[in-house]
Amino acid sequence: MCYGYGCGCGSFCRLGYGCGYEGCRYGCGHRGCGDGCCCPSCYRRYRFTGFY
């Protein structure tokens, strides 16, 4: 998932949970958290910082 702590290139991104996973896309689109590392496409689309 790409929200909360995992939003800033954190543990989830390093463990391999990329934007292809449903949790990561959910975090970018619905939580307003665009992670430039885990979800680059979502980050460019929503223009949110979301780095924790």
UniProtKB/Swiss-Prot annotation:
It comes from the Eukaryota. One of its GO terms (cellular component) is intermediate filament. Pfam families: KRTAP. Keywords: Keratin, Repeat. Interacts with hair keratins. In the hair cortex, hair keratin intermediate filaments are embedded in an interfilamentous matrix, consisting of hair keratin-associated proteins (KRTAP), which are essential for the formation of a rigid and resistant hair shaft through their extensive disulfide bond cross-linking with abundant cysteine residues of hair keratins. The matrix proteins include the high-sulfur and high-glycine-tyrosine keratins. Belongs to the KRTAP type 19 family. This is Keratin-associated protein 19-2. It comes from Homo sapiens.
